[in-house]
Amino acid sequence: MTVGVAGRYGNLSIRNYGQSSALMVDLGLRAELSRLVSWGAAVKNINGAVIGREREPLPQIFSVGLAVRPRDELQLLFDFNKDIRFRLDLRCGLVYQPLKTLSLRAGVADQPRRFALGLSVHVRRLRFDYAYLRHLELGDTHMAAIGVE
């Protein structure tokens, strides 16, 4: 079993309303159930971070899921996600890794309905991530991250 802790710095900027930022702490567990299947669970924003002048609470989310790897370069992902403020969200996705340095991602979710596409590029110990999220009511979101592994 693997245990991990991550710090995330989030910045929100809305035109004509200003910007705000916050530090969030996440905790995760992962266990290999077999050569093909792994299980994971995570709590995001375990520190209850808030944002803005109104101190709006940021999402606190519990997730549990399975990853199935039918081939070395392909993962199928199934996840139950529960934000403490909203209904249970079922998510499904896949990760295709055609090269050791490149991962391509796609996924769908049902609460609310949305889909996402993304990629990761690994250069030595650095990881560069980009994701595009299409929400039927809120429109398009672009996300980027840089990580050290």
Labelled PLM ranges:
Residues 1-149:
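Outer-membrane beta-barrel porins/channels
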